[in-house]
Amino acid sequence: MTMVYANIFLAFITSLMGLLMYRSHLMSSLLCLEGMMLSLFVMMTVTILNNHFTLANMAPIVLLVFAACEAALGLSLLVMVSNTYGTDYVQNLNLLQC
């Protein structure tokens, strides 16, 4: 594994650890998800360019489209939750609590 792949994989793992550890605010969770999507995009692009996969050239663009949709839905959820509860704590989203 080259250093480029190792650094991209480390960025993904760091974002995943941030998502698992700092999940008190919805905004920090969304930022960690965006970091994960960005590292997946870079990993996919570098892999396609290095291996000359001509049929998979559109895959990173499709991933970016899904990441943009995920970001838009996440931000709309953030606005709705902050308007309803006045804060963006993830504990407010737990529906199993009484």
Swiss-Prot record:
The way this protein sits in the membrane is described as: Multi-pass membrane protein
Q: What is its EC number?
A: 7.1.1.2
Keyword tRNA-binding assigned: no
* Gene Ontology annotations of biological process type: ATP synthesis coupled electron transport
Tell me which UniProt keywords the record has, alphabetically: Electron transport, Membrane, Mitochondrion, Mitochondrion inner membrane, NAD, Respiratory chain, Translocase, Transmembrane, Transmembrane helix, Transport, Ubiquinone
The cross-references to PANTHER family, in alphabetical order and at most eight, read: NADH-UBIQUINONE OXIDOREDUCTASE CHAIN 4L (PTHR11434:SF0), NADH-UBIQUINONE OXIDOREDUCTASE SUBUNIT ND4L (PTHR11434)
Reactions catalysed, semicolon-separated, are:
a ubiquinone + NADH + 5 H(+)(in) = a ubiquinol + NAD(+) + 4 H(+)(out)
Q: What is the name attached to this protein's record? A: NADH-ubiquinone oxidoreductase chain 4L
The subunit field of the Swiss-Prot or TrEMBL record says: Core subunit of respiratory chain NADH dehydrogenase (Complex I) which is composed of 45 different subunits.
Q: List the disulfide bonds.
A: none
Q: Which InterPro entries match?
A: NADH_UbQ_OxRdtase_chain4L/K, NUOK/Mnh_C1-like
